[in-house]
């Protein structure tokens, strides 16, 4: 799962208490040059570094897991961030909100923290 840190920043503006991105248990967290929350919704493919290429498989529909802090094991008493996400990130008559995207490996390769990330969007 990949998500844009601008998306988490936008969500944190809506929450009574901010959360850390790790609460979503993603595989990749993108820090973009431009602040574009939820830009990852439109990505068709992602290239990390010079070799690894991923294709977008599906939006990441959120379950209750992000309500549990991975550092403490405690569940948020107000059911956040899921409760807040449901107010603005539900699509296609599905009650599960979306945050991030699932990726499938298209071409393997080595990746490391700080690699340049390229994204493709079909028009």
Pin down the residues of each PLM region:
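Metal-cofactor-dependent catalytic cores
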Residues: 1-123
């Amino acid at each position: 799962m990949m998500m844009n840190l601008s998306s988490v920043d936008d969500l944190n503006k809506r929450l009574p208490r901010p959360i850390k991105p790790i609460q979503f248990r993603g595989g990749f967290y993108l820090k973009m040059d431009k602040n574009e929350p939820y830009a990852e919704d439109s990505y068709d493919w992602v290239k990390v570094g010079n070799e690894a290429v991923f294709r977008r498989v599906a939006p990441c529909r959120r379950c209750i897991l992000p309500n549990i802090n991975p550092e403490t094991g405690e569940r948020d008493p107000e059911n956040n961030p899921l409760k807040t996400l449901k107010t603005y990130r539900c699509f296609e008559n599905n009650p599960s909100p979306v945050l991030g995207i699932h990726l499938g490996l298209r071409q393997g390769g080595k990746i490391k923290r700080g690699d340049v990330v390229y994204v493709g969007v079909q028009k």
